[in-house]
C-alpha cells in the first residue's frame, strides 16, 4: 500500500493556479479514451488508495507520508454541478458526458462520497451510453448491481443482473467473452470476481468495515428471480458463520452474534 500511495503522489501534478492536484495524460478506466486528463475513476481511485495507506499506517504505528494527505485532500475529481453527475474525464465533450462505462464504479468499489442524485444520474448516463454504443467490457457491468442496490431500485437491480452476464455469453458452451460485441475481444474470460462480488457485497448490502470487519451499509435486496441467497462459511477475524438474505432481510447464522452490525 505504501508503494501504491507513493506511486500516486509521483503521478500527480500540482496545479498552482487552481490549487489542486491532477493526474494527466492517462488511459481512461474504461480504456476507450487515451491521453485524457483527470479521468474520474482514476482520480477517485487514487484518493481512496491514498486514504487507505494513511489509515493503515496509523493502525500499524508507521510514519504517514504528509504528501499522501496533501495529495488526497486536494485531488481534483471532475463534477458537473448543474447536471449533478460525474463526467468520464475533464473536458469530455457533451455527447460523451458519460460514455465511460467505468465511471459509476466510483460508487463501488471506490466508495467516493456523493449525493444520491449524483450517484443516480451518473449511473443513468452510463446505462444510456450502453444502449447507444453497446455494452462495453465485462469489468463495469459486472459491478453495476452493487450500485443498483445502493440506490435501492428493484427494477434496476433486476435489469443489471441480466446486463452483468447475458451479453457476454458465447455459444455453444456459454463461455464468457470480455466484451459485449460478438467478436474482437478475449474469449473464455475467467476473471469472475465482479460477478462474485454481486453476491458477497451487492445483494447483502455489506461493506468491509474497520470496526467489525464487515457491516451492513445498505438495505439487502435480491433480484426478483432469486428468492434466497446463502453464503456459507464466511470467516472474518476468526469468526465463522453463514449469511442468509431472504425477503430483503439479512441474517447471520452462527458465530458470536445473529445480527450484522448496521
Q: Which positions does each model-derived feature cover?
A:
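Short, well-ordered loop/turn elements at secondary-structure boundaries
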Residues: 17, 100-101, 238
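Solvent-exposed, flexible loop/coil residues
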Residues: 25-31, 36, 40, 45, ...
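Non-catalytic C-terminal accessory modules of carbohydrate-active enzymes
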Residues: 155-262
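A glycine-rich phosphate-binding loop feature that marks nucleotide/adenosyl-phosphate handling sites
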Residues: 24-26, 65-75, 180-181, 215-225
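Active-site core of glycosidic bond-cleaving carbohydrate-active enzymes
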Residues: 39, 43-47, 51-198
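Structured loops at beta-to-helix junctions and adjacent beta-edge loops in soluble globular domains
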Residues: 26, 109-111, 246
Amino acid at each position: 500500500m505504501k508503494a501504491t500511495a507513493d506511486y500516486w503522489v509521483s503521478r500527480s501534478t500540482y496545479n498552482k493556479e487552481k490549487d489542486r492536484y491532477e493526474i494527466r495524460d492517462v488511459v481512461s478506466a474504461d480504456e476507450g479514451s487515451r491521453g485524457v486528463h483527470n479521468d474520474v475513476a482514476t482520480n477517485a481511485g487514487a484518493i481512496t488508495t491514498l486514504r487507505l495507506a494513511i489509515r493503515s499506517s496509523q493502525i500499524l504505528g508507521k510514519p504517514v507520508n504528509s504528501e499522501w494527505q496533501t495529495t488526497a485532500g486536494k485531488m481534483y475529481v471532475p463534477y458537473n454541478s448543474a447536471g449533478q453527475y460525474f463526467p468520464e474525464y475533464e473536458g469530455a465533450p457533451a455527447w460523451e458526458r458519460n460514455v465511460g462505462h467505468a465511471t459509476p464504479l466510483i460508487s463501488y468499489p471506490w466508495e467516493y462520497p456523493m449525493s444520491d442524485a449524483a450517484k443516480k444520474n451518473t449511473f443513468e448516463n452510463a446505462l444510456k451510453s450502453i444502449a447507444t454504443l453497446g455494452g462495453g467490457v465485462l469489468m463495469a457491468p459486472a459491478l453495476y448491481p452493487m450500485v443498483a442496490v445502493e440506490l435501492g431500485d428493484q427494477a434496476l437491480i433486476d435489469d443489471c443482473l441480466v446486463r452483468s452476464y447475458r451479453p457476454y455469453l458465447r455459444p455453444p458452451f456459454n463461455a464468457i467473452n470480455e466484451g459485449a460485441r460478438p467478436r474482437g475481444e478475449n474469449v473464455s474470460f475467467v476473471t469472475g470476481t465482479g460477478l462474485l462480488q454481486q453476491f458477497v457485497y451487492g445483494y447483502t448490502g455489506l461493506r468491509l468495515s474497520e470496526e467489525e470487519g464487515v457491516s451492513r451499509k445498505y438495505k439487502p435486496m435480491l433480484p426478483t428471480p432469486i428468492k434466497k441467497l446463502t453464503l456459507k462459511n464466511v470467516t472474518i477475524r476468526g469468526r465463522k458463520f453463514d449469511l442468509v438474505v431472504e425477503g430483503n432481510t439479512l441474517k447471520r447464522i452462527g458465530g458470536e452474534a445473529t445480527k450484522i452490525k448496521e
